[in-house]
């Protein structure tokens, strides 16, 4: 599955090893979500920093924020790229969140259907 959909809009929720700090997923420390982004800017940042522990751009339990304008409204202290900068970097929003799939009982359960269809 990863060979086909990574990098891309697919988040996999997998069993967390003992090495994963429980604070990374306080609601269910037995799992961890992993994603490899497709966009060149994100991959450039990851190439320089290594693995990043992040959250999605929405409040827990609420719909995903799909535009920079929605992010700025919900999180006014967050800096986002201006429209001209997004255009210069080739950032195009699909309008869909990532698909989230959890490995459980020897099969994938779709927790959120998004841009990737499994």
Please state what every model-predicted region is:
Residues 1-118:
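Active-site-adjacent structural elements in enzyme catalytic cores
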């Amino acid at each position: 599955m990863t060979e086909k959909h990574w990098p891309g809009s697919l988040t996999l929720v997998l069993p967390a090893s003992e090495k994963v700090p429980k604070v990374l997923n306080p609601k269910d420390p037995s799992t961890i979500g992993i994603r490899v982004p497709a966009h060149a800017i994100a991959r450039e940042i990851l190439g320089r920093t290594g693995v990043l522990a992040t959250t999605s751009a929405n409040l827990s339990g609420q719909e995903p924020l799909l535009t920079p304008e929605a992010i700025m409204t919900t999180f006014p202290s967050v800096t986002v790229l201006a429209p001209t900068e997004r255009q210069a970097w080739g950032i195009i929003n699909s309008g869909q969140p990532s698909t989230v799939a959890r490995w459980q009982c020897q099969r994938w359960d779709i927790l959120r259907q998004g841009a990737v269809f499994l």
